[in-house]
């Protein structure tokens, strides 16, 4: 497939914003999409790693994808990419070894390049279309290859945990997670649930694992998420302050203590 401009010349090495090939441009109801014409004049498809210095993903209709994107390796070994945040989306990000999905975030419809090596805060795919500010958004970590970090099913560091909250001066259980995973990002430790969402506030790990010990951990507020160590003053829902201490090193790093520490009781 090629594309000719209004003079009839074949377009090469450029973006075009137009309707699908089978649609008339004067169709008032037609949807417009971005396409990229390679130096050969052919329309780009799949994953393209160096379009003006950026990586872009295209679906099987050659359309540039934006927002949440999912890749799946087919029987021919090629990866097919698709948008997963449209109006009818019910997609849940998760690690599924039987499907071998990979997930990406490609910004807005006028942007489209794959984000890499950075944090993003956004809605889950099924909630993205509405962009409802009353619906929770979550932090996700994007690896240097553009893939959203989602803990694998084989991750040896996955453990069950409970989300605790400090209310009226007491720690109470608010939610249960079948599995959480510890990951180091930019020299700091973070915990993620099975959907790749960064966790925050208090978590109680219910069992020992290879690199995690049972106990209470604290990760700061919802826009922080890094595991805390040492002395911390934390406010409850009434804004009353309470002091905690979390181990600073060794196999118990991050675990809250109960008892005497440096002549102080916690």
Question: Predicted segments — roles?
Answer:
Residues 1-266:
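Extracellular adhesion/carbohydrate-binding repeat motifs centered on closely spaced tryptophans
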